[in-house]
């Protein structure tokens, strides 16, 4: 087994098309894991192994790959850059100790790279920066370095400088060693020479080397003092300082190269070894109670502790069901019986594998620091904790965003319903941001997801992987309802039909709640007019109705219910009677509280070439967008806006038309906002028409 200090669990993340997957391919080639390099544009890359990924040239699932470099074991996760698949980024950041943030040398800090950077900051994942594609037209390393400061508020620590640019790019100067690494044009990564710094770069190299040293020695007071007195620190001392500053995210070591042309990659791999943390150098994962509150205990990263592992991904592939697991503490051996603390059930570990994209090598055991796949686990879902039967525990839960878009689907073949249900069940286990519901009125199957592309891919997987062809309805927006006025009201539930009856009277106030508060229940009852034992029934009854509002049947948000008084009968009152009273109170009073329809607002980030900015902004305004910011770059303008989701369907096609294919955009859910009356009326009418059409079927 590899020593814990020599593990590196890293993710590679960036904007769509910045070169993440190609970077991963080069890492695998250099570490000897693959012999022929797969190219993304050929549909042959190792980590993009789904048919949909190969065809679209984007990464959808986080593929996990193990490899070795200089006696260190890398567990590498290649994450998607498209915003519809950010759940994969969330998921992988949870189990990573460090990362490589890839930026395009010409595109710079693009919309999705900003989102991923924010997620990585929130997860406190140490990173190095790799500015890729320096062989591209318009590439400018130092411009991208400046963008990371200006746009991401990052502190990039320049470690190398490029030799040549665009077509002339041939290598890099290592600022620490003052050595130039120059590659030939064969595309073979090992074909390079180590030379002296080119004469025309000496002054620039010394300038940036001095900045590097000044930043690094701030991590060590003694070194800083010695440096101020004119003593130059050794390379080993500098590396130690850079490692410390990287781990605390004081700065981000920044490299450059061309993954596609195989130039500069070795220095990035060396940086992973030298600067990114081992599993026992990051803050340990907190343990929680059943409600998700931290207990004050932690999963100490050590093979000698009791087992604590997190199932972070479920996949169904040609080999069967795979559960990807990060082991935080303890050991796991083939044949062990472990506890799933979420279900309370035990499972016996059959086969365990070290993953290499869509291939695998079976292993007998694994321990703290490992990322592995377990074959054939039955009752495990993403986010479940796997632990020692004698030492139950729960790791901090994974939180996933709520879906904002839905489509109705039905199998083309009438006998395909069961096949579809089984397939969708497997897909939900794999992707927690993908949901399914059955419409109570129509009986239709409703698929919910994070965006058009997300659901498009799911329909494609159902067809190709599971052989289920679907009839797909128009995308539907996840509207919500709320109230805008306070109502003081009462309701009495009374039923007598011989024998003991049912009785429950409640007096209450409903009022608008705080934003994002959901449903809040309070009781100010005094004197026992409604005994305390019935309060939970009142809360349960009212809360159960929050899924169906009175305007158009959408879920209701942000309502506060206060139970103020009431009455009960010693014989006829029961929990069920008060629950029924609360349900009726909802129907009676929500309609009086001036209900309002809410629509999801998306945070939209658009890149437009300079000559199309006017068209792009005009189009966003027509879509009821509110422009928040415009940031000028070298190659175009970033426009940030809040836009209703209902106005964004088909936007990618419009943007491509307006910008001749050069525009890009990302969007993510921001908040719910009141619908204008004209929009609300239209939505209500559409719901009525849909229900009328369903009633005729």
From Swiss-Prot:
Functional note: Catalyzes the GTP-dependent ribosomal translocation step during translation elongation. During this step, the ribosome changes from the pre-translocational (PRE) to the post-translocational (POST) state as the newly formed A-site-bound peptidyl-tRNA and P-site-bound deacylated tRNA move to the P and E sites, respectively. Catalyzes the coordinated movement of the two tRNA molecules, the mRNA and conformational changes in the ribosome.
GO BP annotations listed: ribosome disassembly
Annotated protein name in UniProt: Elongation factor G 2
Entry keyword set: Cytoplasm, Elongation factor, GTP-binding, Nucleotide-binding, Protein biosynthesis
SUPFAM superfamilies cross-referenced by the UniProt entry: EF-G C-terminal domain-like, P-loop containing nucleoside triphosphate hydrolases, Ribosomal protein S5 domain 2-like, Translation proteins
Keyword Repeat: no
CC per GO annotation: cytoplasm
Domain tr-type G residue range list: 5-280
Binding site for GTP: 14-21, 78-82, 132-135
Origin superkingdom: Bacteria
């Amino acid at each position: 087994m590899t020593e814990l200090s020599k593990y590196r669990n890293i993710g590679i993340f960036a904007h769509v098309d910045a070169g993440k997957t190609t970077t991963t391919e080069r890492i695998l080639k250099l570490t000897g894991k693959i012999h022929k390099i797969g190219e993304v544009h050929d549909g042959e890359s190792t980590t993009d192994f789904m048919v949909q990924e190969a065809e679209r040239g984007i990464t959808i699932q986080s593929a996990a790959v193990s490899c070795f470099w200089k006696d260190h074991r890398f567990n590498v996760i290649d994450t998607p850059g498209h915003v519809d698949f950010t759940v994969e980024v969330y998921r992988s950041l949870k189990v990573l100790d460090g990362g490589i943030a890839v930026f395009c040398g010409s595109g710079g800090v693009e919309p999705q790279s900003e989102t991923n950077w924010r997620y990585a900051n929130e997860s406190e994942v140490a990173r190095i920066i790799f500015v890729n594609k320096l062989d591209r037209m318009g590439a400018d390393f130092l411009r991208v370095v400046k963008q990371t400061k200006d746009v991401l508020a990052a502190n990039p620590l320049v470690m190398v400088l490029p030799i040549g640019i665009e077509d002339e790019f041939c290598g890099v100067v290592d600022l620490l060693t003052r050595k130039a690494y120059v590659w030939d044009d064969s595309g073979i990564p090992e074909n390079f020479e180590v030379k002296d710094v080119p004469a025309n770069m000496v002054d620039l190299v010394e300038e940036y080397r001095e900045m590097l040293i000044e930043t690094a020695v701030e991590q060590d007071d003694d070194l800083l003092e010695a440096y101020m007195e004119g003593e130059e620190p050794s390379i080993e001392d500098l590396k130690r300082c850079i490692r410390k500053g990287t781990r605390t995210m004081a700065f981000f070591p920044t490299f450059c190269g061309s993954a596609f042309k195989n130039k500069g990659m070795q220095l990035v791999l060396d940086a992973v070894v030298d600067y990114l943390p081992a599993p026992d150098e990051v803050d340990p994962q907190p343990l929680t109670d059943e409600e998700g509150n931290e207990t004050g205990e932690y999963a100490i990263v050590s093979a000698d502790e009791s087992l604590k592992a997190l199932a972070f991904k479920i996949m169904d592939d040609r080999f069967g069901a795979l559960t990807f697991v990060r082991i935080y503490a303890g050991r796991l051996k083939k044949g062990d019986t472990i506890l799933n603390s979420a279900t309370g059930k035990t499972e016996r570990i059959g086969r365990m594998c070290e993953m290499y994209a869509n291939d695998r090598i079976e292993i007998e055991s694994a321990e703290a620091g490992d990322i592995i796949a377990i074959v054939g686990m039955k009752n495990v879902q993403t986010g479940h904790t796997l632990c020692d039967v004698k030492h139950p525990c729960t790791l901090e839960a994974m939180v996933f965003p709520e879906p904002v878009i839905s489509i109705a689907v039905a199998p083309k073949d009438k006998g395909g319903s069961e096949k579809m249900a089984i397939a969708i069940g497997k897909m939900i286990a794999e992707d927690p941001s993908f949901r399914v519901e059955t419409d109570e009125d129509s009986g239709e199957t409703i698929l919910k997801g994070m965006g058009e592309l997300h659901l498009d891919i799911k329909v494609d997987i159902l067809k190709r992987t599971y052989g289920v062809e679907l009839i797909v309805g128009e995308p539907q927006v996840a509207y919500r309802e709320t109230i805008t006025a306070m109502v003081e009201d009462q309701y009495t539930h009374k039923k007598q039909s011989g024998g003991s009856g049912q009785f429950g009277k409640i007096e209450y106030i409903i009022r608008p709640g705080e934003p994002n508060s959901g449903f809040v229940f309070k009781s100010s009852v005094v004197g026992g007019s409604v005994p305390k034992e019935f309060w939970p029934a009142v809360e349960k009854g009212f809360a159960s109705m929050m899924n169906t509002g009175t305007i158009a049947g959408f879920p209701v948000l942000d309502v506060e219910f206060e139970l103020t008084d009431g009455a009960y009968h010693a014989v006829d009152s029961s929990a069920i009677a008060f629950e029924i009273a609360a349900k009726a109170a909802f129907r009676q009073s929500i309609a009086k509280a001036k209900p309002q329809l809410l629509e999801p607002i998306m945070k939209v980030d658009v890149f437009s070439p300079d000559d199309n900015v006017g068209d792009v902004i005009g189009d966003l305004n027509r879509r009821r967008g509110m422009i928040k910011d415009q940031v000028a770059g070298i190659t175009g303008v970033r426009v940030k806006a809040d836009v209703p989701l209902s106005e964004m369907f088909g936007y990618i096609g419009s943007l491509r038309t307006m910008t001749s294919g050069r525009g890009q955009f990302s969007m993510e859910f921001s908040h719910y906002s009141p619908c204008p009356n004209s929009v609300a009326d239209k939505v209500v009418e559409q719901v009525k028409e849909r229900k009328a059409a369903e009633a005729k079927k």
